[in-house]
Amino acid sequence: MSQQLSPINIETKKAISNARLKPLNIHYNESKPTTIQNTGKLVRINFKGGYLSGGFLPNEYVLSSLHIYWGKEDDYGSNHLIDVYKYSGEINLVHWNKKKYSSYEEAKKHDDGLIIISIFLQVSDHKNVYFQKIVNQLDSIRTANTSAPFDSVFYLDNLLPSKLDYFKYLGTTINHSADAVWIIFPTPINIHSDQLSKFRTLLSLSNHEGKPHYITENYRNPYKLNDDTEVYYSGEIIRAATTSPARENYFMRWLSDLRETCFSYYQKYIEGNKTFAIIAIVFVYILTAILFLMSRRYSREKQN
């Protein structure tokens, strides 16, 4: 068993840039969700088909299941942290080494048996139509220890973030039952608050009074990083960056949301006062450009 328990807080300035961490080949086009479960602690979706290869992997790792974690509030629900920044939630995609081991149960006994991909969820002003396909299934598993067929066409590729650079470290599964190599995508995917709140309506296992209660949160707090634990990064050296990927993404999301608001305002008032609407949208674009250039300049100054 690995001495490093998961999850952890990833300090980007201490991550080691590793040229051997090539881009992953993610083959989810043939993956198909079979069942969705409320385990009483989390939402689990079982898959048939789909696998990982390439990158640092010696062979193919078959997709087994997807787990979802969340918190009481939208700003605190992920297991892993990036520079002490917690996201709204987290998806874990569990894979096992089918070429080397005969079953998932056999694979979990070895430190090269499991690969877990982590995808962060970030609440924004817009619904994620692909994530909604999961949300739509939740009514069928409202009570604990229930399972139902996943009766919707669902393409897992659509839940991958826009950037696939990643952190890597050797830790454990979230319940500490086995070793696992973690692949953490620092770029999140956006979902709406209403979509995340639906998970808080699920019922957990009965408490000591014999009464079920809502799973309002199920994330785990991070464990201290051991002195000999090394976290690697697949991208360029990030120690020179002034902000963590999380904060940098937050700023870019803010700019994106600002533009979306501007376009909505433009569409709303274009018929009533076209001149005013055009002036407003030009002003916001100029402001966005200024803020973006300021952030880039500040980043270069800190790097030097």
Swiss-Prot record:
Induction: Expressed in the late phase of the viral replicative cycle. Residues 1-275 are virion surface. The keyword Cytoplasm does not apply. It comes from the Viruses. Apparently non-glycosylated. Residues 295-304 are intravirion. GO terms for cellular component: membrane; viral envelope; virion membrane. The chain crosses the membrane at residues 276-294. Homodimer; disulfide-linked. Binds to chondroitin sulfate on the cell surface to provide virion attachment to target cell. This is Cell surface-binding protein OPG105. The gene is OPG105.
